[in-house]
Amino acid sequence: MNSKEIETFIQDVRDDISNNLEGLFSYYGFLENHNIRKIVINPNDELSFFEGTVVGMLDQRYCEFFRSKFNVDIDEIVRIDILEIIKSYLPVIRKKIS
């Protein structure tokens, strides 16, 4: 794997989130599952709890995509880039729970 392939992967992640956020919410059932989790766990900060769940699931999604594409685990630097992309969508994610 070279730097161009990694750049392409990172761009694919950006495109996936920006073009498919609604689909990701539907596919993973973020809102439906959140309603069940908050009843059982009863978090003090519901918004942070929701964001953490979404970020965790998307992080796992892209780590698995990376592994399937390159047949190696994602390195920390690329993972940080992916998490920064996910973090940039937190304002949109917050609106979903409001």
What are these regions (language model features)?
Residues 1-35:
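Short terminal alpha-helical segments
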Residues 2-6, 10, 14, 51, ...:
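Intrinsic-disorder-associated interaction segments
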Residues 6, 22-27, 46-47, 59-62, ...:
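Generic intrinsically disordered, low-complexity segments enriched for polar/acidic and small residues
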Residues 23, 60-68, 88, 92-96:
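Amphipathic alpha-helical interaction surfaces
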Residues 35-42:
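Short, charged/polar, low-complexity loop and linker segments
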Residues 42-81:
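Amphipathic protein-protein interaction modules
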Residues 71-98:
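Amphipathic alpha-helical binding modules
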